[in-house]
């Protein structure tokens, strides 16, 4: 039995390719292996930006937290518990102004929690605690950012890989859908390439 967490974040709704392919992967894995699938749609239910109550509350002993801190920390704990319970995480991210959406950034701000999802080991080096999980990261962009002149402007893929790794999620497979704004034929080819990659993932996943 496999527990799957699907996190989508694109505000494009039904037009979102990152949401489409992330959902296909999550549902395909569930169909193959069984288990539970939990979906967290950050666009439909955006997490709040972090506040002073959260920043102070997360390092305050539970019994000493103010009501505002209790409320702020409770949401972060809910997000963290969902990640901890998952064996597989499928994350969909559509590029917004060269980076991930603010909704997804807010989610990472909540789960990046000192003493809970990361700590510090020898020589003060950070060590993530959310280890032993597989992550499928689906990124979408209208242009081509994996190579060429626009590659230096991709502040989405590397950023998300770093944030995942910081909390211990280092087994990350990236699925890109890009180059969809260069006309119908280019979009068709880009989508077909991603469809083939998704099929391969579902056929070979262990």
From Swiss-Prot:
Cofactor: FMN
Gene field: azoR
Assigned protein family: Belongs to the azoreductase type 1 family.
Subunit structure: Homodimer.
Keyword set includes Lyase: no
UniProt keyword rRNA-binding, yes or no: no
Protein keywords: Flavoprotein, FMN, NAD, Oxidoreductase
Catalyses which reaction(s): 2 a quinone + NADH + H(+) = 2 a 1,4-benzosemiquinone + NAD(+); N,N-dimethyl-1,4-phenylenediamine + anthranilate + 2 NAD(+) = 2-(4-dimethylaminophenyl)diazenylbenzoate + 2 NADH + 2 H(+)
Database matches in InterPro entries: Flavodoxin_fold (IPR003680), Flavoprotein-like_sf (IPR029039), FMN-dep_NADH:Q_OxRdtase_AzoR1 (IPR050104), NADH:quinone_OxRdtase_FMN_depd (IPR023048)
Protein name per UniProt: FMN-dependent NADH:quinone oxidoreductase
Binding locations of FMN: 10, 16-18
Comment on bound cofactor: Binds 1 FMN per subunit.
EC numbers for this chain: 1.6.5.-, 1.7.1.17
The protein's role, per its UniProt record: Quinone reductase that provides resistance to thiol-specific stress caused by electrophilic quinones. Also exhibits azoreductase activity. Catalyzes the reductive cleavage of the azo bond in aromatic azo compounds to the corresponding amines.
MF term (GO), any: FMN binding
Source species, domain of life: Bacteria
Enzyme class: oxidoreductase
